[in-house]
């Protein structure tokens, strides 16, 4: 039996060698294919887990953004009410002073300035914090992902995070003061000559606010210039025009300072981007629309108007003397800068454009390949 097998192999030696080679190759290829399939499956599973982890971290970061905005609104409201103190003027009016008309004129300017600044500063706060917390959130994600790896350097240690995030104080301090000055000048120009007895409809009020916005957003006080020669929208109120105090120091910068300066420069780049201007402008449009919605209830037609056939679909038929509109406008700050989620703040926090922009910022700073560019 063995001899016949041996003779068969000798007679078909080349065929047997070829067959053995083919079978061996098939076996090796099969093993190699199985190994590659396992590697692909493991890589896909790792990528899925990493993506899920990053998505969870992103969503958690957005909740932190929302909570931070709400926690800072009382500080913003207090700063506004301190610099634009209309309450002291209303208290004076209760005493029937001889210069009542002069006080009413001051109250007119301060009331419109305060509500307009409230809309601008709240929108800026929402979008700026989205940028800052998603930049730092991206770095924190990379730091967490690198835990346990040898030779890795922490990108954003806690002291750097604190130093970087403290830059928001510019918006609540010098930036807010400058914004108040510019808006007050615009309000004076648009409404200064309007008599307290002059009646305005809601549409008239909307037009006046548009005129104020045009003056504010075309103001040329900023030295910020984009690479294409254009001026970024309102950026100098959120970050100072000049170099940061840290960067001014020619020497003696600590590694923490250098990292903070890098984060601030990256923030500047984001603020100068067309996407940021688009999102901020969208927020401002929504904010002023919501402000008008809040005041619309005071422009409802009365029963007498309805009986006389003045029931138009719009509220253009209902007009109020400016003196009656001033208290309405003056009280809007409590709705705009409310730490209890009002319709105004809720609208800004849940806007799809804001969410998409936040996702893009987080994506850019939570991907190592992007940071290396």
Curated annotation (Swiss-Prot):
Membrane-crossing residue ranges in chain numbering: 16-36, 117-140
UniProt note on tissues of expression: Found in all examined tissues.
GO biological process per UniProt: peroxisome organization; protein import into peroxisome membrane
Location of region: Interaction with PEX19: 120-136
Membrane topology label: Multi-pass membrane protein
Topological domains, Peroxisomal: 37-116
Localization per record: Peroxisome membrane
Cytoplasmic side of membrane: 1-15, 141-373
Swiss-Prot/TrEMBL keywords: Disease variant, Membrane, Peroxisome, Peroxisome biogenesis, Peroxisome biogenesis disorder, Transmembrane, Transmembrane helix, Zellweger syndrome
Targeting to peroxisomes, as annotated region: 1-45
GO MF terms held by the record: lipid binding; protein-macromolecule adaptor activity
InterPro entries linked to this entry: Peroxin-3
Phenotypic consequence of residue 134 to D: Abolishes binding to PEX19 without affecting targeting to peroxisomes
A Gene Ontology term for the protein's cellular component: protein-containing complex
Protein's job: Involved in peroxisome biosynthesis and integrity. Assembles membrane vesicles before the matrix proteins are translocated. As a docking factor for PEX19, is necessary for the import of peroxisomal membrane proteins in the peroxisomes.
Quaternary data: Interacts with PEX19.
Associated disorder: Peroxisome biogenesis disorder complementation group 12: A peroxisomal disorder arising from a failure of protein import into the peroxisomal membrane or matrix. The peroxisome biogenesis disorders (PBD group) are genetically heterogeneous with at least 14 distinct genetic groups as concluded from complementation studies. Include disorders are: Zellweger syndrome (ZWS), neonatal adrenoleukodystrophy (NALD), infantile Refsum disease (IRD), and classical rhizomelic chondrodysplasia punctata (RCDP).
Family: Belongs to the peroxin-3 family.
Protein name: Peroxisomal biogenesis factor 3
Species annotation: Homo sapiens
Species lineage: Eukaryota, Metazoa, Chordata, Craniata, Vertebrata
Gene (UniProt): PEX3
């Amino acid at each position: 039996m063995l001899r016949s097998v041996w003779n068969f192999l000798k007679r078909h030696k080349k065929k047997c060698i070829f067959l053995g080679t083919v079978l061996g190759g098939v076996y090796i290829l099969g093993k190699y294919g199985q190994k590659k399939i396992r590697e692909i499956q493991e890589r896909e599973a790792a990528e899925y887990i990493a993506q899920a982890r990053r998505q969870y971290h992103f969503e958690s970061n957005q909740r932190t953004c929302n909570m931070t905005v709400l926690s800072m609104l009382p500080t913003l409201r207090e700063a506004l009410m301190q610099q634009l103190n209309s309450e002291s003027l209303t208290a004076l009016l209760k005493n029937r002073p001889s210069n009542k008309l002069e006080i009413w004129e001051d109250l007119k300017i301060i009331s419109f300035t305060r509500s307009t600044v409230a809309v601008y500063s709240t929108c800026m706060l929402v979008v700026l914090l989205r940028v800052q917390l998603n930049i730092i959130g991206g770095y924190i994600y990379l730091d967490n992902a690198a835990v346990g790896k040898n030779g890795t350097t922490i990108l954003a240690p806690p002291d750097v995070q604190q130093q970087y995030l403290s830059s928001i104080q510019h918006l609540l301090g010098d930036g807010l003061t400058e914004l108040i000055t510019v808006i007050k000048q615009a309000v004076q120009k648009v409404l200064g000559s309007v008599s307290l007895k002059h009646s305005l409809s809601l549409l008239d009020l909307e037009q006046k606010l548009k005129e104020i916005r045009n003056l504010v957003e075309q103001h040329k006080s900023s030295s910020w210039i984009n690479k294409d020669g254009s001026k970024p929208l309102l950026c100098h109120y959120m970050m100072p025009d000049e170099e940061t105090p840290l960067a001014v120091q020619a020497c003696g910068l600590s590694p923490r300072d250098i990292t903070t300066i890098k984060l601030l420069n990256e923030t500047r780049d984001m603020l100068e981007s067309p996407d940021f201007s688009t999102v901020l402008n969208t927020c401002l449009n929504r904010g002023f629309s919501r402000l008008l919605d809040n005041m619309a209830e005071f422009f409802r037609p009365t029963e007498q108007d309805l009986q006389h056939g003045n029931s138009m679909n719009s509220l253009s038929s209902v007009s109020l003397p400016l003196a009656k509109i001033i208290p309405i406008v003056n009280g809007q700050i409590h709705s705009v800068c409310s730490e209890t989620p009002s319709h105004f703040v809720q609208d800004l926090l849940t806007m799809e454009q804001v969410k998409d922009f936040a996702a893009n910022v987080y994506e850019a700073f939570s991907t190592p390949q992007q940071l290396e560019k």
